[in-house]
Amino acid sequence: MAASVLNTVLRRLPMLSLFRGSHRVQVPLQTLCTKAPSEEDSLSSVPISPYKDEPWKYLESEEYQERYGSRPVWADYRRNHKGGVPPQRTRKTCIRRNKVVGNPCPICRDHKLHVDFRNVKLLEQFVCAHTGIIFYAPYTGVCVKQHKRLTQAIQKARDHGLLIYHIPQVEPRDLDFSTSHGAVSATPPAPTLVSGDPWYPWYNWKQPPERELSRLRRLYQGHLQEESGPPPESMPKMPPRTPAEASSTGQTGPQSAL
């Protein structure tokens, strides 16, 4: 019994010694109470571009020539994706809360590139030289946010005349059927304007053949009273009625009805 009590006391001795010596450890207070970094300190960690006000000068510098040469900024960029088929849309943005994601797009990876309507040499790299169409985002690899900025900057540069674009003049290869076909031609004038001409040409009188007339005469020999000729050129015109005759007919009308 005494041996078991002695063993338990010996087992607890090192733990007690640790607690007794814990007051000798000095913990620095600055590790526990730290000041939160201000916004200015966090922003200062992000590299500031010296070409922010004049972004076109960076494309003329030696640093740009050594890095890109004569190729576009998106020429050597490759997207990271799972599988062999890349997604149809790029990421929304590459910079979130002043932190750059892994493998950023060609514009976000270089902090000295700025999308501006005055930076014509950069905008020309994202426009097809033959058709003038802006390259879509999966082709160049830029994120959706930068692609939207590029589209707005290109349109603004075209409005200011900084970015030249050609509007081709295409001549019609086929004939113009707006006035050549009879169904879409101008409406002919009224019959009253053209004397003796019908509204449509097939309404005009056509003399039947003599052979057909002789056959009909033999067929209806006992029933024909008189032969009718062509219709008159114009209907007989009624003489104009005087106001007195018109009033008399108006008065006799109700009496005859009675």
UniProtKB/Swiss-Prot annotation:
Q: Where is the composition biased (Pro residues)?
A: 229-242
Positions of modified residues (Phosphoserine): S38, S49
InterPro entries, per the entry: MRPS18B, Ribosomal_bS18, Ribosomal_bS18_sf
GO biological process terms, alphabetically, are: mitochondrial translation; translation
Tell me which Gene3D superfamilies the record gives.
Ribosomal protein S18 (4.10.640.10)
Regions of biased composition (Polar residues) lie at: 245-258
Q: Does the keyword Membrane apply?
A: no
Q: Where is the transit peptide?
A: 1-35
Keywords assigned by UniProt, alphabetized: Mitochondrion, Phosphoprotein, Ribonucleoprotein, Ribosomal protein, Transit peptide
A GO molecular-function descriptor: structural constituent of ribosome
Q: Where is this region: Disordered?
A: 214-258
The record's listing under Pfam families reads: Ribosomal_S18
Where is it located? Mitochondrion
For this record, an example GO cellular component is:
mitochondrial inner membrane
Q: How does it assemble?
A: Component of the mitochondrial small ribosomal subunit (mt-SSU). Mature mammalian 55S mitochondrial ribosomes consist of a small (28S) and a large (39S) subunit. The 28S small subunit contains a 12S ribosomal RNA (12S mt-rRNA) and 30 different proteins. The 39S large subunit contains a 16S rRNA (16S mt-rRNA), a copy of mitochondrial valine transfer RNA (mt-tRNA(Val)), which plays an integral structural role, and 52 different proteins. mS40 has a zinc binding site.
Q: What else is known?
A: There are 3 mitochondrial isoforms of bS18 in mammalia, localizing to 3 distinct sites in the mitoribosome. bS18m (bs18c) binds to the same site as bacterial bS18, mS40 (bS18b, this protein) binds to a novel location of the 28S small subunit, and mL66 (bS18a) binds to the 39S large subunit.
Query: What protein family does this chain belong to?
Result: Belongs to the bacterial ribosomal protein bS18 family. Mitochondrion-specific ribosomal protein mS40 subfamily.
> What is this protein called in UniProt?
Small ribosomal subunit protein mS40
> What taxonomic classification does the UniProt entry list for its organism?
Eukaryota, Metazoa, Chordata, Craniata, Vertebrata
Q: Which gene encodes it?
A: MRPS18B
